[in-house]
Amino acid sequence: MVIATKFGIVRQAGTYERRIDNSPAYIRAACEASLQRLGVEQIDLYYCHRRDAAVPIEEVVGAMAELVRAGKVKAIGLSEVSADTLRRAHAVHPIAALQSEYSLFTREPETDVLPACRELGTAFVAYSPLGRAMLTGALDTAKLEAGDFRANNPRFQGEAAAANAALVEQLGALAREWGLTPAQLALAWMLARQPHAIPIPGTRRIARLEENLAAARWR
C-alpha cells in the first residue's frame, strides 16, 4: 500500500473559502499535520496539489526535498503543472509523480506533459480517467444535484452534455462488442495508449472497484 497526500489548498475555517499556499513554512506545517492525522512516520508520496505562482517552483521543491532528507517523505509529486514547470522542478529534486486530469474527454496532457514525464521517468497519475463519471455510461446529467460541482461544469450542461452523451453511447456500443463496460473500455484505452500512466478512478462501491480493476486485463 502506498500512502499519498497533498498540500497547497487551504480552506478557511467556518467559511470554507479556499486559497493556495506553497510557502515553505506551510509545506512543513502541512506535512507535520498529515503525519499526525495519518498516524505514520513517513509519507510515501507527498504532492503539491496546486501551484502558488507567487512562490518559485524551485523554492517549493526545495522545501519538499528537505522533508525527504529528514525522512518524513519518501517521494514527492506535483499536480496540474506544465511540462516546463516539471522540468524546472525535476532539476531541483526527482519528481516521482505528476497528477493531472486525463481521459478520452481530456487529452491535453498528450501534447507535452506526458512526453516530459516519459523523458524524466516521472509517473503520470491520471485523475478523473472516467470523465467525472460521464464515461461510465451511467451518469444522467439532468439529475445532477445542486450541490454537485459537475452541475456548474459546461461539459455537463446543455448542448455539450447532449453531444457528450451521444459520444458515450458510441463508446458503449464498441464496449459491448468486446464484452466490456464503457468504463472498462475507457480505462483499457488509457493503459494501452500510455503504459506508464496510472489511472485513479474514484468509486464508492466494491462492485465498481472490481469492474475498474478488470480493465487492466484488456490493455
Set out the residue ranges of the language-model regions.
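Short, glycine- and charge-enriched coil/turn segments that flank and shape catalytic ligand pockets
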Residues: 12-19, 141-147
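N-terminal small/glycine-rich loop or linker at the start of catalytic domains
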Residues: 4-18, 42, 47
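Active-site groove signature of glycoside hydrolases
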Residues: 35-53
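Active-site mouth loops of central-metabolism enzymes
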Residues: 13-28, 49-54
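Short acidic capping loops at alpha-helix termini that bridge into adjacent secondary structure
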Residues: 1, 5, 41-45, 74-75, ...
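Short, acidic/polar
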Residues: 22-38, 82-88
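Beta/alpha (TIM)-barrel catalytic core signal, keyed to glycine-rich beta->alpha loops juxtaposed to Asp/Glu
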Residues: 51-219
